[in-house]
Design a protein with these regions (language model features):
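Hydrophobic membrane-insertion alpha-helices, especially the h-region
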Residues: 15-19
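Conserved functional micro-motifs across diverse proteins
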Residues: 27-186
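Generic short N-terminal amphipathic or hydrophobic helices
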Residues: 1-2, 20
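Bacterial N-terminal signal peptides that target proteins for export
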Residues: 2-14
Length: 186
């Protein structure tokens, strides 16, 4: 009887530990929830985070990015680009490479985080309206087969824009939807 009780309590503790570990791993890991595959590339993206400021640190210097006007916000999308088939794919991540918006035609281009940022003295702490975007995904990249590159893309979007899709249009056109446009809204 004592052996059976100890076995049940050990099993209960083990089950509780496994449940807790599963919960913490799933809650604490950043998930790139959405992805689409094209002919040569895979694009994976997280749901856009809308903030009023974004910053990154490069060579010990902190730089901050702000929206271009008071009626705009920054949308940050963590993006991963994967080369599955071609030997080497040259990719140019620039304003024309990615747009964010909805399938009804309202879109905003990615902004150059290096040109739009301003150097600040001192440190800045992330909070719900200020986001750290290290590493930044921008510039010329040669992506070999079987490799991937990840980073943050920044968009200067009007307030109220429906951020339903990121449209990747470098090498090939790949839209990645964050919302279900075809769901019956009855």
């Amino acid at each position: 009887m004592i052996i059976f009780t100890n076995f049940r309590s050990t099993l209960a503790v083990l089950s509780a530990c496994l449940t807790a570990i599963t919960f913490f791993v799933s809650c604490n890991s950043e998930q790139l929830d959405f992805g689409r595959t094209g002919r040569n590339l895979e694009i994976h993206a997280s749901r856009p985070q809308v903030v009023s400021k974004a910053f990154y640190t490069q060579d010990g210097i902190t730089r901050i990015i702000t929206p271009s006007a008071s009626n705009r916000k920054l949308a940050v999308v963590n993006t991963t680009i994967v080369n599955r088939s071609s030997t080497v794919i040259p990719i140019s991540v620039d304003p024309d490479a990615a747009t964010l918006g909805d399938r009804k035609g309202k879109k905003s281009n990615a902004i150059d985080p290096f040109a739009r940022s301003k150097e600040i003295s001192g440190a800045i702490e992330p909070d719900p309206d200020v986001l750290e975007i290290t590493p930044v995904l921008w510039g010329e990249i040669e992506l070999s087969r079987g490799f991937q590159v990840s980073g943050s893309l920044v968009f200067d979007v009007p307030k109220g824009l429906r951020l339903g899709t990121i449209f990747w249009d470098e090498v090939e056109y790949i839209p990645v939807d964050f919302i279900d446009y075809w769901r019956d809204n009855d």
